[in-house]
Amino acid sequence: MFKKIYLAVFAITMAMFTSCNSDGEPGGYMQGVFTVQNSIGSPVLWMDGGPVVYPSATAAQQLMANKNFANAERVLLVVTYKDADVTGDSSTSLVVKNAEVAQGSVVPTSVIRTPEMAEADMKFKNYLADDSISTFYDISRENGIWFYKGYMTAQFSSTYYVANSTGILPTVLATYTADENDPKEVSVTLYLNKHKKSSANESGQPASFVSSFSLGDMQQHIMRHSLSEVNITINYETKQGKQQLKKTVKREDFTKPF
C-alpha cells in the first residue's frame, strides 16, 4: 500500500516537471532560459513557467568543469540543514533562519514555495521537529547545456525550491550516465551513504527510492533517444557494503497505472 501511495505521489511530482518543447512533445525544455532575482536577491532560474533552483553561474561552471560529470545527462544533488527555525505562512516564502549546514556547503537563505504547497505546512513543521531538512537539486543536460530544476524532498509530496547565493556546489547525491554508443544502457551511482540524515539511507531503501525516481526520470531519456526500453544499473553503498540493483524500464511502463 505504501509503495503504491509513494509511486502515486512520485508520479504527480514528476508530472510537475514534465514540460513540452516547441513541437508540443513532452520532455523538452523552454529555449531562451533567463534568470531573475527573488525578494532576497538570490538567483533563481525560471523555466517552463515556474521557478527553478539556480545555484549561481559559479556552481554551473564548477559542475561543467568537473570531469566526473563529463558524460552525465543528469545529476541529483542534496543539501541537508539542521537546527533550522522556520517562519512564514501559506501565502509567503518560508524563511529558514539560524540553520547550520549539516552536509554540503550551501548556506540556506529561504525556502520558496508554490501555492500548492500550503497544505504541506504541518508536514513541513513536523519534520523540522527533528531539527533537520534535506533539499534535493535536480540538474539535467540538453545538448551540452545544463538545466537546473527543483526536486522534492524524500519526506514530502510537495516540491520545495531552495534559493542560495553562495555559488558553491552542494554535495553530489547521485549521477546518471548513459552510454554514448548505446543509450539503452544507463548507469546510476548513489552517494546516499554520505548523508546520515537521509531517511532513504537510514531505512536502507536507497535502491527503492532511486528505482522509483528512475522510472519517471527515464521517460524523458527513452523519448529523447526513441528507445523501446532502458536497462538501468544502480550502484550504491549501505552499512553492509557495496550493492547493485538492475532494472529494465520499458516504454509501455509509462502507459500503465501505478
Which sequence ranges carry the predicted segments?
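Positively charged n-region of N-terminal signal peptides that target proteins for export
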Residues: M1-I5
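Sec-dependent N-terminal signal peptides
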Residues: Y6-I12
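C-terminal motif of bacterial Sec signal peptides marking the signal peptidase cleavage site
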Residues: A15-S19
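Bacterial signal peptide processing site
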Residues: N21-G24
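Cys/His-rich zinc-coordinating "finger/knuckle" motifs
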Residues: G27
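First exposed extracellular module after export/assembly in secreted or surface-exposed proteins
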Residues: M30-F258
